[in-house]
Amino acid sequence: MALRPNDVTLRLTPPLAAAARRNRRAAAGGVRVYAVASGAVSTKVENKKPFAPPREVHVQVTHSMPPQKIEIFKSLDDWARDNILSHLKPVEKCWQPQDFLPDPASDGFHDEVKELRERAKEIPDDYFVCLVGDMITEEALPTYQTMLNTLDGVRDETGASPTAWAVWTRAWTAEENRHGDLLNKYLYLTGRVDMRQIEKTIQYLIGSGMDPRTENNPYLGFIYTSFQERATFISHGNTARHAKDFGDLKLAQICGIIASDEKRHETAYTKIVEKLFEIDPDGTVLAFADMMKKKISMPAHLMFDGEDDKLFEHFSMVAQRLGVYTAKDYADILEFLVSRWKISDLTGLSSEGNKAQDYLCTLAARIRRLDERAQSRAKKAGTLPFSWVYGREVQL
């Protein structure tokens, strides 16, 4: 659930008044899409599709990786088979959602559901907003598999390709699919959330896609996934700790087991980028700096529930306040990756590579300073109704 650093600094004003929100929603029939080229002046593009949410989409740069570099990834297929597929688990050894949920075939099913619902009554709405947001993010998995299959040199060319890259993408997707299934079923059983509004949000999100700005470029794509897997590991880990604090040990176990998967996937993606630094340090450090200058966005940044066209922003504000995922986490992830990939130790770089190295090694500290300054100036945000919790007001 990756917030961008400026998301936090720009979200600290109180939310719009209810009347203003209603007016905005009423005017949302003609959807506005903002196309922004890197370093260019914003250009407003009118999108007349009434079923799509208002959203910001950048000018789509495609196939930015030089064709000769595709050969790097083809040559790494055997390496990926030996070093990346080992981070997958055989299906028979994987946990399944049913392992953590009441058994509908059991005579004690109704009692187990009743106990689950009793525990859920002790959990506040703002936590459920974060948990729902995490679940919706996981449920947009078709988009993420699609994104991986846009990457030149590693995509699944047939839908059943035997290359190590294609095997990884399909098996990673299959493992991730359990996360949304488990959280979805748990939330349904609690009775605390409006499942129809949540299901609408999922449909809107998958229909909207995502805008990671990875340009069909596996250098950019694997840097993005390295960052995102660590972000989801942190987010699910924090929801697990909160659930434990609320006394729901089963929910803590659910969030914790998902976090452990994300950690394993993070290890695989960061290992891919580590290999790229070994083979092509200059090209990889330039790609890393490029992604950080664009700012890493959460995969679900285009979420919409049919009512709130700033839903992702408001959800992120709640997550920031509760400490589920924060600007500090964003800076910590960056710092972790800079250390993991030994950016400060790179030598023999071009002049542009040296500039990228300096930028990356100082960026985390800059982000922290900006966040501290913003927090010191921030006014207390108000409350906002979330459709996911039946329109109840939640503190931003």
UniProtKB/Swiss-Prot annotation:
It comes from the Eukaryota. Disruption phenotype: Increased level of stearate (18:0) and reduced level of oleic acid (18:1) in leaves. Spontaneous lesion formation in leaf blades, retarded growth, slight increase in endogenous free salicylic acid (SA) levels and SA/benzothiadiazole (BTH)-specific inducible genes. Enhanced resistance to the blast fungus Magnaporthe grisea and leaf-blight bacteria Xanthomonas oryzae pv. oryzae. Residues 1-32 form a transit peptide. SUPFAM superfamilies: Ferritin-like. It is found in: Plastid, Chloroplast. Its EC number is 1.14.19.2. Coiled coil: none annotated. Pathway: Lipid metabolism; fatty acid metabolism. Its main location: plastid. InterPro entries: Fatty_acid_desaturase-2, Ferritin-like_SF, RNR-like. GO terms for molecular function: metal ion binding; stearoyl-[ACP] desaturase activity. CDD domains: Acyl_ACP_Desat. The keyword Lipid metabolism applies. One of its GO terms (biological process) is fatty acid metabolic process. Fe cation 1 binds at residues 138, 176, 179, 262. Fe cation 2 binds at residues 176, 229, 262, 265. It is an enzyme of class 1 (oxidoreductase). Binds 2 Fe(2+) ions per subunit. It holds the Pfam family FA_desaturase_2. Its cofactor is Fe(2+). One of its GO terms (cellular component) is chloroplast. It catalyses: octadecanoyl-[ACP] + 2 reduced [2Fe-2S]-[ferredoxin] + O2 + 2 H(+) = (9Z)-octadecenoyl-[ACP] + 2 oxidized [2Fe-2S]-[ferredoxin] + 2 H2O. Keywords: Chloroplast, Fatty acid biosynthesis, Fatty acid metabolism, Iron, Lipid biosynthesis, Lipid metabolism, Metal-binding, Oxidoreductase, Plant defense, Plastid, Transit peptide. Homodimer. Converts stearoyl-ACP to oleoyl-ACP by introduction of a cis double bond between carbons 9 and 10 of the acyl chain. Required for the repression of the salicylic acid (SA) signaling pathway. This is Stearoyl-[acyl-carrier-protein] 9-desaturase 2, chloroplastic. The lineage of its organism: Eukaryota, Viridiplantae, Streptophyta, Embryophyta, Tracheophyta. The gene is SSI2.
